[in-house]
Design a protein with these regions (language model features):
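Thiamine diphosphate
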Residues: 1-164, 169, ...
Length: 312
């Protein structure tokens, strides 16, 4: 594991943009008066002529990005997840998704870990909304290393991509020599025979914590990092279900429509088995420190451990 203890993936996004901008002259970045918060300010300072601040007009920004993509540019649209998937949904669907344009949507401040900003800014529905758009790739990186890799992979992929980044710092878990990011391919971080914990985003680190606690009780858990919600790595999901017979999904997102739903849909078709979904249970969030909210909504390592044990 890296010596870097924790990094917010929104910071990873900003740094990755700058690094990519040095070699990709057709990369342009659009923001909606949030360059400081989304960390696109890092790119803006390095390449001011390729950064466009559209003001507080997310729908217009999305349309501008669509137009730029038809002129040979690769636009990265940047704003909070609530605005990217909510306020601009119609434009994302019709202006980017429908014509399958080469636009990348970077949504920061996702999930309840937004913290004190409260329920109106804690988007726990974005993965569901974006997953249902035909042809949209949906990525939810688990840490700094993965977020940077996702940005480059998104740039190299032709078509619409939605990427989810967080405000709160999270542990770096992928800083290993053999780490490889590939769109649509999950990563097995730990193998066990008793249960498969399939996690995404910041919950991957918490899933690993839970697996350690389970191991102390003699329960061997497989832990899988699904960084790409769509296309889902169905082969890996089915293999884990066959090997353990019990699957638990964990996400900092509603239990409706996100990773849990995607995994359940896959196994319903391919290998029916018990699936327990851990996430935000059909409620709005509230204002508070990110760490406290993670615990309150049962998404920390201890809570996951308890819920996995109860499901066995």
């Amino acid at each position: 594991m890296s010596e870097v203890k924790a990094v917010a993936t929104r910071d990873s996004y900003g740094n990755a943009l700058k690094a990519l901008g040095e070699k990709a002259e057709n990369l342009v970045v659009l923001d909606a008066d949030l360059a400081g918060a989304t960390k696109t300010s890092v790119f803006m300072k390095a390449f001011p002529d390729r950064h466009i601040d559209c003001g507080i007009a997310e729908a217009n920004m999305t349309g501008i990005a669509a137009g730029l993509s038809t002129c040979g540019f690769v636009p990265f649209v940047s704003t909070f997840a609530m605005f990217a998937s909510g306020r601009a949904y119609e434009q994302v669907r019709n202006a980017i998704g429908y014509p399958h344009l080469n636009v990348k949507i970077a949504a920061t401040h996702a999930g309840i870990s937004v913290g004190e900003d409260g329920a109106t800014h804690q988007c726990n529905e974005d993965l569901a909304l974006m997953r249902e758009i035909p042809g949209m790739v949906v990525i939810n990186p688990s840490d700094d290393v993965e977020a940077k890799a996702a940005v480059e992979a998104a740039y190299n992929y032709y078509g619409p991509v939605y990427m989810r980044f967080g405000r709160a710092a999270c542990p770096v878990i992928n800083d290993t020599p053999d780490y490889k990011f590939e769109i649509g391919k999950g990563i097995t971080l730990r193998e066990g025979k008793d249960v498969a914990i399939i996690a995404t985003g910041i919950e991957v680190a918490y899933a690993l914590e839970a697996a350690e606690l389970l191991a102390a009780d003699g329960i061997e858990a497989t832990v899988i990092n699904i960084h790409t919600i769509k296309p889902l790595d169905k082969e890996l999901v089915v293999a884990a279900a066959k090997a353990t017979g019990k699957v638990v999904t964990v996400e900092e997102h509603s239990t409706i429509g996100g990773l849990g739903s995607a995994v359940a849909e896959c196994l319903c078709d391919e290998y029916p088995c018990k699936v327990t979904r851990i996430g935000v249970n059909d409620v709005f969030g509230e204002s508070g420190p990110a760490g406290e909210l993670i615990k309150k909504y049962g998404l920390d390592g201890q809570s996951i451990y308890e819920k996995v044990k109860a499901s066995l």
